[in-house]
Amino acid sequence: MNQEVMNLFNPTTPAPTFDQIKISIASPEKISSWSYGEIKKPETINYRTFKPERDGLFCARIFGPIKDYECLCGKYKRMKYKGIICEKCGVEVTLSRVRRERMGHIELAAPVAHIWFLKSLPSRIGLLLDMTLKDLERILYFEYFVVTEPGLTPLKYRQLLSEDDYLRAQDEYGEDSFTAMIGAEAIRELLRSMDLEKLAADIRVEIANSTTELKPKKLAKRLKIVEAFQASGNKPEWMILTHVPVIPPDLRPLVPLDGGRFATSDLNDLYRRVINRNNRLKRLIELRAPDIIIRNEKRMLQEAVDALFDNGRRGRVITGANKRPLKSLADMLKGKQGRFRQNLLGKRVDYSGRSVIVVGPELKLHQCGLPKKMALELFKPFIYARLDAKGHSATVKQAKKLVEKERPEVWDILDEVIREHPVMLNRAPTLHRLGIQAFEPVLIEGKAIQLHPLVCSAFNADFDGDQMAVHVPLSLEAQLEARVLMMSTNNILHPANGAPIIVPSQDIVLGLYYLSLMREKEPGEGMMFADMGEIDHAIAAKAITLHTKIRGRYIGVDADGKRYSKIYETTPGRMKIGELLPKHHKVPFDVVNKLMTKKEISNMIDTVYRHCGQKESVIFCDRLMSLGFYNAFRAGISFGKDDMVVPAKKWQLVEETRTLTKEYEQQYNDGLITQGEKYNKVVDAWGKCTDRIADEMMKEISAVKKDPETGREKQINSIYMMSHSGARGSPAQMKQLAGMRGLMAKPSGEIIESPIISNFKEGLTVMEYFNSTHGARKGLADTALKTANSGYLTRRLVDVAQDSIINERDCGSNNGIHMRAIIDSGQVVASLASRVLGRTAVEDVVEPATGDIIVPKGTMIEEHHIERINKSGIQEIKIRSVLTCETRNGVCGTCYGRDLARGTPVNMGEAVGVIAAQSIGEPGTQLTMRTFHIGGAAQLADSSFVETNFEGTVRVRNRNVARNSEGDLVVMARNLAIVVVDHDGTERAVHRIQYGSRLKVDEGDTVKRGQRIAEWDPYTRPILTEVDGTVGFEDLVEGQSMSEAVDEATGIAKRVVTDSRSVRGADLRPAIVLKGKDGKVSKLPRGGDARYTLPVEAIISVDPGQTIKAGDVVARVPMESAKTRDITGGLPRVAELFEARRPKDAAIIAEISGTVRFGRDYKNKRRLTIEPTEGGDAVEYLIPKGKHIHLQDGDVVEKGDFLVDGNPAPHDILAIKGVEELAAFLVNEIQEVYRLQGVNINDKHIEVIVRNMLQKVELDDAGDTEFLDGEQVDRIELAEANERMKEQGLKPATGHPVLLGITKASLQTRSFFSAASFQETTRVLTEAAVNGKVDPLDGLKENVIVGRLIPAGTGAQMNKLRVTANSRDDLILATRGESEEPSMVEGSADAAE
């Protein structure tokens, strides 16, 4: 009883627990049952008394009292009358909070259609009635009648009649012989008279009997909606409203402003219109007004209700007094400002503050400096409690006074309160989980938050005015999670790639680099030291310097933990760093006995973390930081003008290039090359020149000068130190300072031909300065635009992947994907070892030479395995992948592998989907913000040759080469590859060489590292001849299919193939044929004529009658001129891949292996058929004539070969080559974009996203399931249905996976809450309501929305415990029920209640 007295003012009823939420269409009875009364008047409140009008929109009788426990007229006040209804004003005496919960309703005089079911495409009413939207609107808005009961007349059921037709029919057949209705009543009648079961059966018969392609699809849609109504228990006529619910008044408030005016929610205006029109309609009906007036009023009522539900969906937008569209109920849910995204997924938080950040170098890694003022405010409740407990104050009021006066005891108590109470720091934008971390606060004076320098890279923070927010975790659980999971000391590794993120940068790196320098002939060279004490002494006495070569004794630990000492040749500086190393046998002094660049420091921290654990690494990093800062300060490194060394050979190189470009101009003037080729060559020449000058500059800057007398090395160039150590600046920036700025891009992305020859030291000319302004501006504009794009990409990724949670240890799958090293133009860009680290092997990994097992099946591949894999020369390993994981909901731990942020196997309940989305999205923003860092200087990325990285012997696969007139070996095959094998026959590298390249090596040659093995012209694609002969032209008609363009500048003609379609009646197939001595067309070696069909825009390189040799070029197809490869191409490219859009000029992929045949042309397309080798049907492709087809008649293609160049569409790869190939393609393409920017993301993140893009299966055969052929079904739903079929001995459904873009996949998740809060809210909710969908609340988003713990991390454990507890309760109750008498059970149940 005592408890109840205490809680009178805020009675806490336990929130009802639920496991799922169902949404369906509300019936009129349901709406009435929600309502507390009908609203009859449009009035809101009385303007004099400010009391709500009775029966109005704010009526207290319907919605409840305005003040707590007080009726409107004031007769009953206070608690003792709780629950009494005042006889005078009719208001119940209760809490005013009920005004947020109680609903009312409006009874409509005429039914109206619900606009969502009418207009939200596809129109549900339209589909169900099989009528077009246009016809429906004609009926609803009172233009046409519809026949609902034809009687014996020749009229048809559902036939539309205009007013005149209707009157005519009445005259003709008599008034009572048929019934025709108009407006929503008519539609309601049609919907009510539907027999869904019969309709469904009829449609199924129709689908079975239909012959055309389109009809079944249309019928299937209709069948789906009919079955949805049957299954969900919704009745079709409920889509027409007879009652309109009115939401509680406190959710659409009317607030008095100062000056006697009111601010009101738009909903009140919209409701008022509905009530006014409804009342007027009632009155008109009572008055028996003419039909036309009543009809007009009904139409207006329909429009008013439409505007209330979704303003602007149909017809004009209804605007308020200030011409602003009114916010309807639908607008309250939609978009960034709607209920879902503004209030449910993102909330404002109390116990938080924000301030500017400053650097706190004396803090430990787990600390942050919190201003006292902020702490006092944030921890107020804790302080009050502690003051009370210590007896400093008796009441909260007294405590408040003490705190306000800032008495000395308050500060002592604040210290106690804060001790070991972590706070969370957050820097916006929070792009990945490292954007919020927990720290222990240290009280400081001042008003700025102090941040530890090493966590800056995780927050992406700098101290130029950034602000950060502080949040206080209140409950014990929250504090525990903050400490155990979110403490900055737990986030040493980056979740995207597993590399350390607590890495020194800038000054610290510079200090450590300076410390580890070794110089010749310094004082005291060759001295020997026993320990650090001696070294410090010697430095203090100036007997040695930090960079002297000395011999020092380092005491290490061996594998058994015994100490040993060893003498190293080193420097005092390196000994200082070595002193900080934790003692461990796997962390020897060699780790620091080298020049410490940023990369080396990162490797060192990684080594320490892997072997010595977290605690040691944190202490090590902190000490490293102090050492670095101190030595950077002691070194006093800065740079002046003389440090920017302009290379001596610069002008010589520039002159050489100028001569070269003059030569190209001359070739162009002589007509040897085209304008486009000249442009490409000039740009290329300047690009090479810039690089060579940069190399010269780097040589000169990095050269170590010696004192001629003593031979002592001088101080290294400061700029070089900064760049080489990785502290600041890149070679690209140094090139601009002291080399040559190089080529610039126009805003369009084209490169300007004339480069900037000056550098910043020399200063730019006016012309050069003007050319360079493009890049700078484009950079700034790009940044602004791309930040938004990147944020949107992250949002879509999170939405598609949020359900991927680790839900079981091992799914037991034996499938996986094959991993190989990624080689790009001969360079190994991602080694096999780096790709398989932290993944699980599907099969034993065996060393090829000895047959030893390196990694047993089902074991995770760790660092120590990697060394052996690298040595053994294994080419391919099959590993488990989330793509082939068989877990129903979520993913299993074994398929996922290592948790990159911890370096251990992934924990149960880890939200790997969100981590993947963040890892891919975060650099997106980074990259976009970094576009202009090179100041728009164009970076060319065109290769025209292949060099090998390995020594060995050359093997040529698919060797098909010819010697051309110049005696070069020319590649004639489409799939020729050069393989370099080492002495024991292991393949070291495979280079695909493109058609038309000139080979520099041949079968059996030996090659050295860096030797060029092939080269080609990067600007044109050649068409080569395979036989010798004399040239003849076919269908090359001047002015129709070929134009002789005379270049104005040179006066020389060149022949270009043009599009003959533009000339009427000309069906020309331009080609070059080769004729033998007898004048007949030569035959190719593999049969077929030597006829080369020419694509549009090909430039012909030969003349008729000319004699040429095999391997010579007959025509060239120009490539697009070089554009700068910037991440600008990158971000849209990544989005395009994840959205699975078909590229503009998609490649055409062979679906089967077979022989190519060309058939008759079809209009403006060429017909290409592949006759399969194995037998079966031939496949036909129609290819536009402008596309260059590589193949000749009779060529043999493999399944999956490209028939036409271009970017392949991912859907085709999936259909032809399967899931593994698709995943490999997407992973490689996306990685390429990030790699270009030097961003490292682990493959598994991309795989997680791709898994979610493959959620749906398209059924080839629905078997005996409830699905239809060709329908797209969720993978899990299909598996469940097939299990049911197997149990019943029926035929299961079969299908093939389909690829959906991330937006589409997010909208088709099983959870309608998640989809509705993502995009297209109206459509998602409409569809869910019609289907009577149940949201099982499995994902993260749904649970955040309904305010429960998310089913990941600690929430997953809580869920598990709840499930176990429930099942245990059921068990106990069941056993109790068996043992005792039934009556007893009833009694005990009552007692429990």
From Swiss-Prot:
Binding site for Zn(2+) 1: C71, C73, C86, C89
A cellular-component GO term for this protein: DNA-directed RNA polymerase complex
Cofactor detail note: Binds 1 Mg(2+) ion per subunit.
Cofactors, names only: Mg(2+); Zn(2+)
InterPro entries: DNA-dir_RpoC_beta_prime, DNA-dir_RpoC_beta_prime_bact, RNA_pol_asu, RNA_pol_N, RNA_pol_Rpb1_1, RNA_pol_Rpb1_3, RNA_pol_Rpb1_3_sf, RNA_pol_Rpb1_4
A Pfam family this chain is assigned to: RNA_pol_Rpb1_3
Reactions this protein catalyses: RNA(n) + a ribonucleoside 5'-triphosphate = RNA(n+1) + diphosphate
UniProt keywords, alphabetically: DNA-directed RNA polymerase, Magnesium, Metal-binding, Nucleotidyltransferase, Transcription, Transferase, Zinc
Keyword Electron transport recorded: no
Positions bound to Zn(2+) 2: C811, C885, C892, C895
GO annotation terms (biological process): DNA-templated transcription
Protein residues bound to Mg(2+): D462, D464, D466
SUPFAM superfamilies for the chain: beta and beta-prime subunits of DNA dependent RNA-polymerase
Molecular function, one GO term: magnesium ion binding
Enzyme Commission identifier(s): 2.7.7.6
Subunit structure: The RNAP catalytic core consists of 2 alpha, 1 beta, 1 beta' and 1 omega subunit. When a sigma factor is associated with the core the holoenzyme is formed, which can initiate transcription.
Task of the protein: DNA-dependent RNA polymerase catalyzes the transcription of DNA into RNA using the four ribonucleoside triphosphates as substrates.
Protein family according to the UniProt entry: Belongs to the RNA polymerase beta' chain family.
Alphabetized HAMAP family for the sequence: RNApol_bact_RpoC
Descriptive protein name: DNA-directed RNA polymerase subunit beta'
Species in which this protein is naturally found: Azorhizobium caulinodans (strain ATCC 43989 / DSM 5975 / JCM 20966 / LMG 6465 / NBRC 14845 / NCIMB 13405 / ORS 571)
Gene name in the database record: rpoC
